[in-house]
Each structure stands twice: as C-alpha cells, then as structure tokens.
From Swiss-Prot:
Function noted in UniProt: Probably involved in ribonucleotide reductase function.
Annotated source species: Rhizobium johnstonii (strain DSM 114642 / LMG 32736 / 3841) (Rhizobium leguminosarum bv. viciae)
InterPro entries with a match to the protein in the record: Flavoprotein-like_sf (IPR029039), RNR_Ib_NrdI_bac (IPR020852), RNR_NrdI (IPR004465)
Entry similarity comment: Belongs to the NrdI family.
SUPFAM superfamilies: Flavoproteins
Protein name in UniProt: Protein NrdI
UniProt-listed HAMAP family: NrdI (MF_00128)
NCBIfam families attached to this UniProt entry: nrdI
Amino acid sequence: MGLIVYYSSRSENTHRFVAKLGLRAARIPPSGAAGAFHIREPFVLIVPTYSGDGGKGAVPKQVIRFLNDAENRGHIRGVIAAGNSNFGETYGLAGDVVSQKCQVPYLYRFELLGTEADVANVKHGMERFWTREHL
C-alpha cells in the first residue's frame, strides 16, 4: 500500500486522525523545513484546511512549500482534507485547491478529528485505492 503524507499544526488534529488509521505515514515538518522534506514514492496527502478571508490561505504554507518541489508533486496520487463545517463553503477547501492544482482526485473530507466512521472510510478507501493503478 502507498504512503500517507500529512501536515498537522500544533493542534495535532490531523496527526491524531492519521495515527488512528494505523497506516504507513510521513509528516510534513511544521517548521520552514518543509522545502527540504522529500518523498520519493507515491502518496496520498492529508491536509487540514485553514479558513481565511474568502478562502485565501486555505492550504498551509508548509504544504505549499512541500508541493512546490516538482519531485514531491510528481508522486502525489490523491488528497484528503480536514476542515471545520462551521466555515461553510470553505469546509475542506484545501482539498479542492490541491486536487485542482496537482490534477489528482479529491478522495475524502472529514471534520476536525474525524469520527470512527471517517477513520474506517479512509482506511478501507486507501486499501481499495492502492490496489488499483495508483502506484
């Protein structure tokens, strides 16, 4: 099965969700070192959504730096987004942005820490996803 690459801020919400999955994962560093963080195999990105003015700043800067590396970007196969439904139409917006910019499927979105159902859906979805032609 492929790799999960994720970013989690100090809140650790995304980190806790990924830990519940029990899948192989690599965390994008929270500091400015994201540009030096390299992944050289296929991965699905799990990204939190930050709400800004009109959706600006939805994708964390560390994730942008990571994806600005052409080789990292070349290995992304899909995206999953975390968000907060209180933000209305910007809920999970980071997933839309990454999906469009990287031309990969937006596979799933979940709220905050995710529910047990979200964990099961993502875990089973990843198993199905990686058994197809995404490697």
